[in-house]
Amino acid sequence: MNYLENFTQKITDSGIEEEPAIVQYCKVLAAMIPSSLFVLDMVQKRFCYIKPDDLFLCGHSMEEAMTLGYDFFSKIIHPEDLPLWKSFLGNLSRTLQENSDEWSDYFGLFRLLPKYPFITKSLERYSYHRLIPVRKESGHYYLIGIVSDSKCKKIGCYRNGASRFIYQAYNPKKRGWHIQQIPLLSRRELEILAIATGEQYLHFIAEKLCLSYYTIRSHVSSIKRKLKVQDLREATDWISYLHILQSPQERDREESCCSTRNFTFNKN
């Protein structure tokens, strides 16, 4: 279990029912990570907490987001992606109501619509949402969302499977989950992805692995075909979401937070 799962498990197991205590936990979590973070009360359909970070707020005020609750997502998520998000939230709410033991590693990829002063043209920003449901013994449940920038354009809602060979993709039309097989990457392809930072560094990768530029280019073409992505940056993000290979940012974050895994706070 990584530090994030360990931290949210403390919230679930703590026996704390008061919302302020849960928010206090999440404020500490927000300080530990560079990403945006929000806590959504899925029963009352409102935000309990939003980290004051512009990535998630997209230029809107904290007060506006807290006032609008669920409706705030209509302000920041691309209109083409919004129906998927709403359908996923509805499905997750039903799942948590029916199964108190439900816990899955959910994540979503959406286009956000940041609002900038003096720019009238609508801009898109691809984002990754780590989605963690937290269910209290009282039956009340929350959704912790951790939002960061992404190079991956595979818009959708996903959850990692029990096996490292599969994941599940949410189908909003059928309102259900469908198993997808994770493409099998060769050892050499994984080595390339482990050190890849962009297409312009193929010569660097070739030198690092003592292979020719054309051999590396052939492997990269195979990676893009298997993962159905456009470039190496998108590929490295996608495989980190599926836990095929941790991204350097995730490794650095986990190592920097390892000393806080046993964190507790005064409940009084």
Language-model-detected regions and their locations in the chain:
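Recognition helix of helix-turn-helix DNA-binding domains
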Residues: E199-E234
